Amino acid sequence: MAKEIKFSDSARNLLFEGVRQLHDAVKVTMGPRGRNVLIQKSYGAPSITKDGVSVAKEIELSCPVANMGAQLVKEVASKTADAAGDGTTTATVLAYSIFKEGLRNITAGANPIEVKRGMDKAAEAIINELKKASKKVGGKEEITQVATISANSDHNIGKLIADAMEKVGKDGVITVEEAKGIEDELDVVEGMQFDRGYLSPYFVTNAEKMTAQLDNAYILLTDKKISSMKDILPLLEKTMKEGKPLLIIAEDIEGEALTTLVVNKLRGVLNIAAVKAPGFGDRRKEMLKDIAILTGGQVISEELGLSLENAEVEFLGKAGRIVIDKDNTTIVDGKGHSDDVKDRVAQIKTQIASTTSDYDKEKLQERLAKLSGGVAVIKVGAASEVEMKEKKDRVDDALSATKAAVEEGIVIGGGAALIRAAQKVHLNLHDDEKVGYEIIMRAIKAPLAQIAINAGYDGGVVVNEVEKHEGHFGFNASNGKYVDMFKEGIIDPLKVERIALQNAVSVSSLLLTTEATVHEIKEEKAAPAMPDMGGMGGMGGMGGMM
């Protein structure tokens, strides 16, 4: 297929047009008074969203060069969301402003490479000032404030996220699901839970709830399949002498072994339950090891030279309470050494940092949470499917942003942090590097201006007023007042501001230093020919009518 090439100003102007269109669609969602965007779906009802990245993801332009510009900035919005959970609109607004200012200067003759160098230096200096101005997230109240702002000022969502984090800790897993009704709920599972239920309903101790509960129990862990009773008989006799319940976690328990366990349970000889080991393959081995470390036990594996026949009571794990239903097993109050658990947690964190697979990362984070204290499930309620999707997106964003705040700290929100940081930056640059520096200094005012415009105020006037002051002084777009942002709880995670600025500068630099674009020429499809009408029979005899 033939390709078309665009050069220099012609290419950059078309790229800018794509960035402008994306920016104009996304910018309206910014701030507490941001507007909704209605998105047509290929089937079903249109979706309504105030989430910048959801809007950006839907945008495809007909002009191939303009579309390339839009796609590059869209990628920046997505990357910002992935890394920080929020700040997609901030990144888009910054990228547009930097590109617009830069394009004007490059068209006037500035050297793009020198301009880029100045932009990079300015961004780095601003980020350093942001870090100095940040403060660590203190208590539950600040977590609630961050989550509320990221959920588009929904205080109920902010409170749910803060409650969830308080219950499971900053390393705990918090998942978001759809509720059955219209109310939002929070469910917390304490201890380690895995998705394997009892192998026989005859192990049940509570017939009403259909659960098996074992208190102060031993746990036998093995990666073997148990089919013969003689494999575990010596160990059973030893545990019976101790008079404690026993949970067996094995690859499988079948045949004679399972039958004998059930019969002895029913007769009251043994207080016992059995479940299959969680996971598959290598992940199963790692999860068994996690349970062993949490409970102070040892996985009985032939790979380690251990056999069930020769196993001692010292190899068994211990837990204060174990609850098993038909689908899940929950181990609470494992008696493992806290130092061993900390070492295992550190090991899993290292694996999370080094893995490139999203699936592996998710599974490792689940394991980390189970070792760290529990899993919280936020159940989002809504009256309609459209509202449910929009609300679920907001909760996901707020959750990620809150984790970012706990990780790196917080700065004042409402677009004021960038302006305050820039006020403290004074770089002695020359020529076109200085042009790049000044481009960034002007562009960082854009987020605050846009928040004010969306709330119905004059962006320029608001920016000027904020620039006149220092410290935590900023603009509350919810009520149009100038306030102490920290006292009002208007805060942003440092990580969100940092990544938004870094990504915006990165993509703008790429666009400004682009000298040519190559794209396919769309071939015009010829209109299909009219079908052959054939001879119009019978017309020949009309001569006789004369």
From Swiss-Prot:
Location(s), subcellular: Cytoplasm
InterPro entries: Chaperonin_Cpn60_CS, Cpn60/GroEL, Cpn60/GroEL/TCP-1, GroEL-like_apical_dom_sf, GROEL-like_equatorial_sf, TCP-1-like_intermed_sf
SUPFAM superfamilies: GroEL apical domain-like, GroEL equatorial domain-like
UniProt enzyme class: isomerase
CDD domains in UniProt: GroEL
Gene3D superfamilies documented for this protein: GroEL, GroEL-like equatorial domain, TCP-1-like chaperonin intermediate domain
NCBIfam families xref list: GroEL, PRK00013.1, PRK12849.1, PRK12850.1, PRK12851.1
Function: Together with its co-chaperonin GroES, plays an essential role in assisting protein folding. The GroEL-GroES system forms a nano-cage that allows encapsulation of the non-native substrate proteins and provides a physical environment optimized to promote and accelerate protein folding.
Protein name, per record: Chaperonin GroEL
Organism annotation: Helicobacter pylori (strain HPAG1)
Organism classification: Bacteria, Pseudomonadati, Campylobacterota, Epsilonproteobacteria, Campylobacterales
Gene: groEL
